[in-house]
């Protein structure tokens, strides 16, 4: 493969936090990462459960709440609050990436997310025109590190096949092995997420979307997505690339609700 093309590279090394998160008496470990998020956002999630902390002497709130999250297969985030002297435990299905940047600091909590540290959050993004009748569904929603299963947090393109795409630019080659795309949660997912390709490259950005074929194919989803489907594409080895593109080949309005690259 040419020097400017995609290259295999060494595994990206990071420090991860391991928190006990099985039944309290158990020993299972689960990866958790701390993140700041507004209490209001957590409470507004499509699914959040709250429990009063009723702990025996010497028990740790963090262990209790982590355990509550682990026992729910839909849980993506947990918080013990108030943070200084917690009396409650929140578990939620809200997607919050570890590098999410909270803007509402008035009621901020230190929470713990199950999501991995990724490259898409806060990176540069270009894309086709968004669908004007839905002004909130802009490309920036894909890189803000936050998703609450609300359609207005998705990116929605115009109908033209010249617009059914997005490109992430990391600024320099980065190592990753997974690209994950979230389809919308309703039955129209089959129309708006249909025949999607992901391509990667280190070369100078090309003219989208007609020149995307010059990039290396990372993965593809040839069918129609089901409501809320999470599409994970995985390379057999970690690889290095600067650009990641997503392109729907089916000519219709393209909608993606969340992206992770790690």
Q: What is each of the regions a protein language model found here?
A:
Residues 25-38, 95-130, 260-262:
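Extracellular/luminal ectodomains of metazoan preproproteins built from arrays
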Residues 84-86, 95-97, 132, 172-175, ...:
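Conserved beta-strand elements of beta-rich interaction domains across eukaryotes
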Residues 50, 163-167, 175-178, 230:
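Intrinsic-disorder/low-complexity, polar/charged segments enriched in Ser/Thr/Lys/Arg/Asp/Glu/Gln
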Residues 66, 88, 241-245:
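Short, conserved beta-strand segments of beta-strand-rich sandwich/propeller modules, principally
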Residues 159-165, 186-262:
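Trp- and acidic/polar-enriched beta-sheet ligand-binding modules for extracellular glycan
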Residues 111-173, 184-191, 220:
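Disordered, acidic Ser/Thr/Pro-rich linker "stalks" and the adjacent N-terminal cap
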Residues 77-98, 194-195:
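Disulfide-stabilized extracellular beta-strand modules
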Residues 5-76, 155:
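Conserved small-residue hotspots that stabilize compact domain segments
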């Amino acid at each position: 493969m040419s020097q400017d093309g995609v290259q295999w590279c060494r595994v990206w090394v990071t420090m991860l936090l391991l928190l006990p998160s099985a039944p309290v008496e158990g020993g299972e470990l689960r990866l958790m990462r701390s993140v700041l998020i507004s209490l209001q956002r957590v409470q507004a999630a499509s699914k959040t459960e709250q429990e009063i902390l009723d702990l025996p002497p010497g028990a740790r709130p963090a262990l209790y709440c982590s355990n509550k999250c682990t026992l729910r297969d839909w849980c993506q985030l947990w918080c013990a609050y108030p943070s200084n002297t917690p009396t409650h435990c929140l578990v939620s299905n809200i997607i919050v990436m570890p590098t999410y940047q909270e803007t509402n600091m008035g009621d901020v909590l230190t929470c713990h997310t199950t999501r991995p540290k990724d490259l898409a959050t806060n990176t540069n993004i270009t894309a086709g025109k968004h669908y004007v009748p839905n002004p909130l569904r802009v490309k920036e929603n894909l890189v803000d590190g936050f998703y609450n299963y609300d359609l207005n947090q998705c990116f929605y393109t115009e109908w033209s096949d010249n617009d059914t795409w997005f490109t992430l630019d990391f600024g320099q080659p980065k190592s990753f092995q997974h690209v994950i795309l979230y389809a919308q949660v309703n039955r129209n997912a089959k129309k708006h997420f249909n025949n999607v390709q992901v391509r990667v490259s280190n070369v100078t950005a090309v003219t989208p979307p007609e020149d995307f074929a010059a990039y290396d194919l990372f993965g593809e989803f040839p069918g129609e997505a089901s409501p809320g489907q999470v599409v994970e594409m995985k390379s057999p080895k970690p690889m290095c690339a600067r650009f990641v593109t997503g392109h729907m080949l089916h000519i219709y309005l393209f909608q993606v609700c969340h992206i992770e690259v790690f």
